[in-house]
Amino acid sequence: PIPRMGGLAIFFGFILSALIFVPLSTPVRGMLLGGVIIVILGIFDDIYALPALPKFFVQIAAALVAVLMGNQIDILSNPNIFSSEPYWVLGIWSIPISVLWIVGITNAVNLIDGLDGLACGVSTISSMTMLVIALTVAEPEVALLMAALSGGCIGFLPYNLNPAKIFM
């Protein structure tokens, strides 16, 4: 059998880099704490094969921690070329949409983890893309977090490619 919990290797590399190099502002602490909750959930799920509903509620709680500590989507750009409004200000919808987004991304990555290297490869591409965007718009904290995440994924990827020696 192939060992599981390889995500711990990514997470430990990520969290260590984040704690050393990233200033621990309230939003960063929220992201890290939400991530710790998700990692603990993943450990329990790997060991006990938890039912979907309790996992979903824990994911919502983890997302709420991150969102309520300042990580929320306040404005969306409007792709409708026929609208005079280039942006949508979310107002009171900011928190539920942000939670929905985080839970959705969490589950999307979990769902694509069925093929060797797929989730890790997609996460590497995504985090490197966000790294470049963060550098472009002068968001150094986000850039450092994305550098740490992409580094963890790149370090794990050779062990997760077909034939996988460990699963995320």
Positions of predicted regions on the chain:
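"…together with the soluble PPM/PP2C metallo-phosphatase catalytic core" -> "…together
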Residues: P1-M168
